[in-house]
Curated annotation (Swiss-Prot):
Keywords: Acetylation, Cell cycle, Cell division, Centromere, Chromosome, Coiled coil, Cytoplasm, Cytoskeleton, Kinetochore, Mitosis. This is Dynactin subunit 3. It holds the Pfam family Dynactin_p22. Residues 135-157 form a coiled coil. The keyword Protease does not apply. The modification N-acetylalanine is found at residue 2. GO terms for biological process: cytoskeleton-dependent cytokinesis. Its main location: cytoplasm.
Amino acid sequence: MAAVTDVQRLQARVEELERWVYGPGGSRGSRKVADGLVKVQVALGNIASKRERVKVLYKKIEDLIKYLDPEYIDRIALPDASKLQFILAEEQFILSQVALLEQVEALVPMLDSTHIKAVPEHAARLQRLAQIHIQQQDQCVEITEESKALLEEYNKTTMLLSKQFVQWDELLCQLEAAKQVKPVEE
């Protein structure tokens, strides 16, 4: 029963494909896509049977597919001597990994501590503190910019006052010099 519905679904898909290829007006000359595919397959089979190199190529493709299968390597049996050579070649690496694994196993009780288990509870607080920190950094930047502006204004004002005091000093010196130059009347 299921095979019949699969065939019907396949037939419906082929008919839809034919509508896409030939358009809504129907097939041209009552030629079906499936018929065309069968003809192409037969032609390829005829060509392949006549050429020896094509036959060899088909066999090599099958071998290639077999070798690319990940389970193929698992099926190949290595002699124990080869396995021993692999293990001896990687002895230092294996020993270093064992040492690291022992360190991890020694640290497992720390992972089960109440401090680590309380991390999710503190995550919300940490998030709030991070937001406050970001806001304070923004405020710090604003205050720094305002301070720079105030310092620039202070420097300008100090410069102007210095110039004004220098002008007043020069004027006062000129007035004092003029007063001393006048002949003293007796």
